[in-house]
Each structure stands twice: as C-alpha cells, then as structure tokens.
Amino acid sequence: MGARFSRIAKRFLPKSKVRILMVGLDGSGKTTILYKLKLGEVVTTVPTIGFNLETVEYKGINFTVWDIGGQEKIRKLWRHYFQNAQGLIFVVDSSDSERLSEARNELHRILTDNELEGACVLVFANKQDSRNALPVAEVANKLGLHSLSKRCWLIQGTSAISGQGLYEGLEWLSTTIPNKPERSTSVSSFRSDSYERKLVRGPRY
C-alpha cells in the first residue's frame, strides 16, 4: 500500500530541471543521440545549422538538451549557449582517429570558459559499434581527459544507433549534477579504470 502510494505521489511531484549543452565536431552523431534519447528510435538527420532543443525525461529529471551544430564556422558560437549549463555532453566519433586531436583542442578550449566552470563533463565516445572504433580508454587518453584533475568528468562508450551506453551516461548525470546551486562542488579523489571498453571515470564531485 505504502509503495503504491509512493509511486502515485511521484507522478505529481515537480520534476527537477537540468540544462545540458551537447557539442562536438560535425559528424560525431550528436543529433542522432538526441533523438534516440527523446524518441527511442533512429531518425534521419542533416548537419545541424544552429541548434536542436529537446527535453529528455529520465528518472524524474527533465534534461533540457541543447544540441549545437559542430561545423567549424559554427563553433565560435558555442559560447553563447554556455550560461547556466549544469552539464556538458561532448560527443566524439571513436572511429575517426584523425580528428581526435581536433576534438581535443575544441574540448579543452571551451572548458577554459568561466561559464562552464562548474559544469560536469560527460564524453560520449560514440560509434563504438564501428569496426574502426578505438577503445574508450584510448579515446580518453587522446582527448587528454586525465589532465582535467579539477573537474568532474566521465567518458562513456556509446552507439547512437543501438542506444548502447546512452542511458548509462544519463544515469551518471542524474546522480552527479547538483540539484541545488548552493551545493558544494569540492573534489573528492576518485578514479576507476575498470571500463571494459565502455567506461572511464574522472574525479567525482
């Protein structure tokens, strides 16, 4: 009886709202990921000129996800969306090793912006279903993630087509992003390298 009442009550409780910015190089699969999370299916996409905005509900949290185009000429506009972002999803194509240095430069460039100082960083190492996909640990090294010693981050292997790893990423965001602005963001030293080609964790706030 009590459990049933609890389930009913949750339907009427206000949902937490979290603002997420999703960026990455063009062709990394950002928009496919967004609509896989939103609709549960793969949709036909075209290169994003501007942005896509959708709300994804997960475990009582409304994630407002801003998917920003990744073409080089658009990247200088990313900073206009940084304000009030509580989480950053950075999507990389694990199968395109030639562009990982470019992705690294863009990631570290935007993380110097004060507007993203408190944002948790979730890296989706996408296209893990590709024959040419690099192991997640190698992607993490090429992106220089272990140098982000003062920031909360996680890299998650994903496939936008099958949905592999996407909800694991949302789970991490839902348990990591502070629900209240005044909550402390001090670092507690934590890192686990048991990833099985899927997961590499950074320090947990």
Swiss-Prot record:
GO terms for biological process: protein transport; vesicle-mediated transport. It comes from the Eukaryota. The keyword Protein transport applies. A lipid is attached at residue 2 (N-myristoyl glycine). GO terms for cellular component: Golgi apparatus. Its main location: Golgi. InterPro entries: P-loop_NTPase, Small_GTP-bd, Small_GTPase_ARF, Small_GTPase_ARF/SAR. Keywords: ER-Golgi transport, Golgi apparatus, GTP-binding, Lipoprotein, Myristate, Nucleotide-binding, Protein transport, Transport. Belongs to the small GTPase superfamily. Arf family. This is Probable ADP-ribosylation factor At2g15310. The lineage of its organism: Eukaryota, Viridiplantae, Streptophyta, Embryophyta, Tracheophyta.
